[in-house]
Amino acid sequence: MKKVNHWINGKNVAVNDYFQTTNPATGEVLADVASGGEAEINQAVAAAKEAFPKWANLPMKERARLMRRLGDLIDQNVPEIAAMETADTGLPIHQTKNVLIPRASHNFEFFAEVCQQMNGKTYPVDDKMLNYTLVQPVGVCALVSPWNVPFMTATWKVAPCLALGNTAVLKMSELSPLTADRLGELALEAGIPAGVLNVVQGYGATAGDALVRHHDVRAVSFTGGTATGRNIMKNAGLKKYSMELGGKSPVLIFEDADIERALDAALFTIFSINGERCTAGSRIFIQQSIYPEFVKRFAERANRLRVGDPNDPNTQVGALISQQHWEKVSGYIRLGIEEGATLLAGGPDKPSDLPAHLKGGNFLRPTVLADVDNRMRVAQEEIFGPVACLLPFKDEAEGLRLANDVEYGLASYIWTQDVSKVLRLARGIEAGMVFVNTQNVRDLRQPFGGVKASGTGREGGEYSFEVFAEMKNVCISMGDHPIPKWGV
């Protein structure tokens, strides 16, 4: 049986307590995983603290070289890492191999460039004073990463953190530990010094809590549920925070939209990554005049999506991360039907046509709930699975009101050919990101983050400075500015 240990100060550290990680498609035990706690966190933070001064003072060009080297190693191992990710998460192999793992490599390439642009600004004052700013690393950072796209999200945090001169302790979700372990190994192979990146496995209540509370941790970058994020900010003390939390993102489709493209994007945005994505367009608002036809075609296509073995390159929807999560998502489907929604595709039960080796897997068919009322729980609460809620709206004003009538505010999607309408809605919609006539297309230069219960702070490009860098002001006198003469 494979054993996954911690990576602390460049060493593979075994412990006494282990838990098992399983393949969500088959139930097969994949590995015994080290269960870290306060002792391992203390060791990892101490190692990161000791490594920080030398790493922070390494020339930017050298840090950039090491970032590129790590990105190259990921590129060289895409098939292996993708297979590992698919086995551990149930994500379809065509998504991990062709999109998610290559994107992880690009994170390091991108931030290798960003770290060489850590330029401050100068502010001359009346020819008598000169102010200038220094952009400096924070110190030891806690990186707490989720299970839905674990390798990509881990690198999305590790790359800017390390490139900007910080050291880190990465705590991956206990549901998806395998690729984080590989990342720790590849970082050392790339030549990143011991202690700069430490990977501690374990549960949130033990390893995660000890990490974010640690007094030597200066910044916390967390991606996960809103309740956990609130708890971290309540208990972890005065630190820098980046919190990317839950979402219930609206899709507004107006009658003048390019319906074919809107249909393509709406299906992709909710059902890709098994629907387990924070930016999923889970509330799809369709203008009344096109509602019946759009709903009919959406449901027909959802019924045709291929659910099955994540290792099959033709599979579009794989297995949900765990049996517990399957029960949660299935329960929401039942709740939606009880609340009065119309079930047009999918349903709360496992597919009946699965092959024998997948019968015990956490599979759900892509589910379409139509005629949803925005006050229903299925429209207000994050389901985090392949469940689309379809709702009609009358006009622009009602569409905007319904889109904003939710506690979350991460992503949003607008479909219309009316530029004036786009400009009004983009300003009025309560979300950190607005995508117009497109699915979620990420550019690493753009800020990523949400408003309201979807979190605080931004990451991406120079916006990653918010959590991973400190701005220091230096004020220099030219020598003859007036100084009050007290006590003369």
PLM regions: where:
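Hydrophobic face of amphipathic alpha-helices that form TPR/SEL1-like repeat modules
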Residues: 1-25
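N-terminal alpha-helical segment of soluble enzymes
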Residues: 24-89, 289
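Conserved C-terminal structural/oligomerization subdomain of aldehyde/semialdehyde dehydrogenase
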Residues: 26-32, 217, 252, 306, ...
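Short, well-ordered beta-strand elements within core beta-sheets of diverse protein domains
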Residues: 29-36, 50-57, 143, 251-254, ...
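Long amphipathic alpha-helix in the N-terminal Rossmann-like dinucleotide-binding domain
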Residues: 46, 68-79, 93-118
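Rossmann-like NAD(P) dinucleotide-binding subdomain of oxidoreductase/dehydrogenase enzymes
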Residues: 120-261, 393
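A short hydrophobic/small-residue beta-strand
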Residues: 167-169, 343, 433
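ALDH superfamily catalytic-core signature
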Residues: 227-373, 436, 483-484
